[in-house]
């Protein structure tokens, strides 16, 4: 049976993640409070940020930026799209 949680991002009951997707205390917080659906939304948003800002994941500043954006997206005020960004669907 799938574990269910009240997702902090979605504000409703949803399927939980099967494993902690991030190391440390933050990963534990994500595992306990963020749904699979919200995590997938973050992964899509993260991909857009990496591409639009041309981030290199070997750069510690880029990783720090993405971690802060992840916290904002999942738990806080949200993460803004880059200025001038338009999706292919628009």
UniProtKB/Swiss-Prot annotation:
Disulphide connectivity of cysteines: none
Recorded GO MF terms: iron ion binding
A matching Pfam family: Iron_traffic
Gene Ontology process terms (BP): cellular response to oxidative stress
Entries under NCBIfam families matching the protein: PRK05408.1 (NF003817)
Function field: Could be a mediator in iron transactions between iron acquisition and iron-requiring processes, such as synthesis and/or repair of Fe-S clusters in biosynthetic enzymes.
Protein name, UniProt field: Probable Fe(2+)-trafficking protein
